[in-house]
Each structure stands twice: as structure tokens, then as C-alpha cells.
Regions:
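Active-site cofactor/cluster-binding pocket
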Residues: 1-153
Length: 153
């Protein structure tokens, strides 16, 4: 993967409500601001108080617009969409630019997860007609592995 330096970028984190999307977005935003970037954020909470895990109505999001210069809005469509599960991908893809990058937690794209998101096939990217670059990363496994020697799980 090629590294590109950009004047500005919009990143949208999305996943189940309660899974830490606001926390992840806030940490990412704070780090970005600490290294000298200007930021503007927008948390996106679902209407459901506590929707069933993996459901379409329970997707929570956090968008951050990062810029080398002044940033005045959280941005319209994102350059990077982080989708922690199929429901997040399905409900949030509309916010991703056509030339954007989609990062998914491949650990959360099993048959039962796709069923909860009401996909009809086992290929959500094809079913949604996704043309953006997709980076499938085993995020959950990586987190568990990094915590294996701690008392956290």
C-alpha cells in the first residue's frame, strides 16, 4: 500500500453502538490535533437505545475531518470508512467517497454477521456494488493478540 500525504482527510469510524466508535474517534482526533492538525468532529448515535448487536439500526459512528490548515466542518463524505461489521458497512457506505478507502474488521464478516445485516450473499462488497479499495484487517484478532499477556480480555 502506498502512503500519501494529504492536506485534509475525512475519516468515519462505524460499528455497533457500545463498541467504542466514539472513543476510537476521539482518540484518533486527539492524536491528530496533538501533532498539529486542525480537526472538526461529528459523533453519530443511533436512534435505538440499545439495538441488537450487529443490527442495521444499532450502528454508531464518529466522523473526523483532519486538515493541515483550518477545518470548519466535519466534512461531507469520508475518504476513509472504518466498518467494524457488515451492518456498519451497509449503512455507512453512502458516506464514503467513490475514490475512498474502506477498512473492515474481517473477523466480523462471518456468515452470521452477514445474516444480521440482511445480506443475501456471502460477498457484501459485490452485493453493495463497492468500487472503493477495501482493506480487510483482522482487527478483533489483533486486539486479542495484543492483550494475551495482560489480565484484560
Amino acid at each position: 500500500m502506498m502512503v500519501k500525504e494529504l492536506e485534509e482527510v475525512v475519516v468515519r469510524f462505524s460499528g455497533d453502538s457500545g463498541d467504542g466508535m466514539q472513543l476510537a474517534g476521539n482518540i484518533f482526533s486527539n492524536v491528530s490535533a496533538t501533532v498539529g492538525n486542525d480537526i472538526c468532529t461529528f459523533p453519530d448515535y443511533p436512534a435505538d437505545i440499545r439495538a441488537p448487536q450487529g443490527s442495521l439500526t444499532g450502528v454508531s459512528g464518529f466522523q473526523v475531518h483532519i486538515g493541515a490548515g483550518q477545518v470548519y466542518t466535519p466534512g461531507d463524505r469520508c475518504h476513509v470508512l472504518v466498518a467494524m461489521n457488515p451492518s456498519a458497512l451497509k449503512t455507512q457506505i453512502k458516506f464514503c467517497k467513490p475514490q475512498g478507502l474502506i477498512i473492515t474488521d474481517s473477523d466480523s464478516f462471518e456468515a452470521r454477521d452477514l445474516e444480521k445485516a440482511q445480506f443475501k450473499t456471502d460477498n457484501p462488497f459485490e452485493e453493495l456494488g463497492i468500487k472503493q479499495e477495501v482493506l480487510e484487517v483482522p482487527i478483533s484478532s489483533m486486539c486479542k493478540e495484543s492483550l494475551k499477556d495482560s489480565e484484560l480480555d
